[in-house]
Amino acid sequence: MSQKQEEENPAEETGEEKQDTQEKEGILPEKAEEAKLKAKYPSLGQKPGGSDFLMKRLQKGQKYFDSGDYNMAKAKMKNKQLPSAGADKNLVTGDHIPTPQDLPQRKSSLVTSKLAGGQVE
């Protein structure tokens, strides 16, 4: 039995050695292939973010997510311009409760409604 154990132990060691050499060989061909590709395409490994165009767009930042954001920003710009054009700074709202006498008279419409007329057809 001692001979069998001795025979098994060297076999296990050689199996472990084979795995180690396979790992080393697995790394070496990858490194060799990587070096070959770097030699073939030298400009690819230098920029770790993409093309110049992509980097410029990313640095610029995104202004609007979609057309809704664009339209809301456009409306805000118009609202900022209106008060500066000519607003009454003395106008205070909320202090006075309007009454029917304070409200201006309603303009009569030029087209008469069929419902408002007293004619029944």
From Swiss-Prot:
Q: Which residues carry this modification: N-acetylserine?
A: S2
Report the family membership: Belongs to the endosulfine family.
Compositional bias of kind Basic and acidic residues: 16-37
* Known role: Protein phosphatase inhibitor that specifically inhibits protein phosphatase 2A (PP2A) during mitosis. When phosphorylated at Ser-67 during mitosis, specifically interacts with PPP2R2D (PR55-delta) and inhibits its activity, leading to inactivation of PP2A, an essential condition to keep cyclin-B1-CDK1 activity high during M phase. Also acts as a stimulator of insulin secretion by interacting with sulfonylurea receptor (ABCC8), thereby preventing sulfonylurea from binding to its receptor and reducing K(ATP) channel currents.
The molecular function terms in GO held by this entry are: phosphatase inhibitor activity; potassium channel inhibitor activity; protein phosphatase 2A binding; protein phosphatase inhibitor activity; protein phosphatase regulator activity; signaling receptor binding
Could you describe the post-translational modifications of this protein? Phosphorylation at Ser-67 by GWL during mitosis is essential for interaction with PPP2R2D (PR55-delta) and subsequent inactivation of PP2A. Phosphorylated by PKA.
Summed up, the tissue specificity of this protein is: Present in striatum (at protein level).
**Subunit-structure text:** Interacts (when phosphorylated at Ser-67) with PPP2R2D. Interacts with ABCC8. Interacts with SNCA; interaction is disrupted when phosphorylated at Ser-109.
List modified residues, type Phosphothreonine. Answer: T21
Q: What is the lineage of its organism?
A: Eukaryota, Metazoa, Chordata, Craniata, Vertebrata
**What subcellular compartments does it reside in?**
Cytoplasm
* GO cellular component terms, semicolon-separated: cytoplasm
- What ranges does the record give for the region Disordered, renumbered to this chain? 1-53, 79-121
Q: Which GO terms describe its biological process?
A: cell division; G2/M transition of mitotic cell cycle; mitotic cell cycle; regulation of insulin secretion
Phosphoserine (modified residue): where?
S2, S43, S67, S108, S109
UniProtKB keywords:
Acetylation, Cell cycle, Cell division, Cytoplasm, Mitosis, Phosphoprotein, Protein phosphatase inhibitor
Judging by the UniProt lineage, the source's domain of life is Eukaryota
Q: What is the name of the protein in this document?
A: Alpha-endosulfine
